[in-house]
């Protein structure tokens, strides 16, 4: 009797049952590994509450000239002030060379009448006063830090006291005439 030869594929070039099982098992194994690894990869994404804090949209249409509001961005207070023409003129008249942290008013604002900055004193992290009508505004008609006596002008620049830097300006953009996107 002649011995039959066993080949890996049939004469028409079709895959054999063995090849089908190998490919099928490999595919199922790859899907299983992907499903097992997915929770670990997904864990590295930021949480939904963190993403929600990434940016804040502020409607500034209700803020009267000379008034200010405080919003929260990334867990910090952000001061948004609708400055008067007098505040703008006084802030722009200051020689930057006379400041501890030299910065022009124009470099701190995108639109002259709107000042947006993080309301945390750069000395030890207190929240300066000056947002409300009855708050002390310091010697330069801006903000006053009650913790150690730092005085900021109407552009948020340090003018007197122990704070080393100006109040920081967060990244922001006007999406239209009355809406500011912070962050």
Swiss-Prot record:
Cross-referenced SUPFAM superfamilies: ISP domain
Subunit and interaction comment: The main subunits of complex b-c1 are: cytochrome b, cytochrome c1 and the Rieske protein.
Keywords: 2Fe-2S, Cell inner membrane, Cell membrane, Disulfide bond, Electron transport, Iron, Iron-sulfur, Membrane, Metal-binding, Translocase, Transmembrane, Transmembrane helix, Transport
PROSITE patterns: RIESKE (PS51296), TAT (PS51318)
EC number(s) given by UniProt: 7.1.1.8
Record function comment: Component of the ubiquinol-cytochrome c reductase complex (complex III or cytochrome b-c1 complex), which is a respiratory chain that generates an electrochemical potential coupled to ATP synthesis.
Lineage start: Bacteria, Pseudomonadati, Pseudomonadota, Alphaproteobacteria, Rhodospirillales
Any one GO molecular function term: 2 iron, 2 sulfur cluster binding
Annotated Rieske domain residues: 88-181
Note on cofactor: Binds 1 [2Fe-2S] cluster per subunit.
Ranges that cross the membrane: 21-41
Other known facts: The Rieske protein is a high potential 2Fe-2S protein.
Cofactor(s) the protein needs: [2Fe-2S] cluster
Catalysed reactions, as listed in the record: a quinol + 2 Fe(III)-[cytochrome c](out) = a quinone + 2 Fe(II)-[cytochrome c](out) + 2 H(+)(out)
Protein name listed in UniProt: Ubiquinol-cytochrome c reductase iron-sulfur subunit
Cellular component per GO, a single term: plasma membrane
CDD domains tied to this protein: Rieske_cytochrome_bc1 (cd03470)
Annotated positions binding [2Fe-2S] cluster: 121, 123, 145, 148
InterPro entries assigned: Rieske_2Fe-2S, Rieske_2Fe-2S_sf, Rieske_Fe-S_prot, Rieske_Fe-S_prot_C, TAT_signal, TAT_signal_bac_arc, Ubiq_cytC_Rdtase_Fe-S_su_TAT, Ubiquinol_cyt_c_Rdtase_Fe-S-su
Protein family according to the UniProt entry: Belongs to the Rieske iron-sulfur protein family.
Membrane topology: Single-pass membrane protein
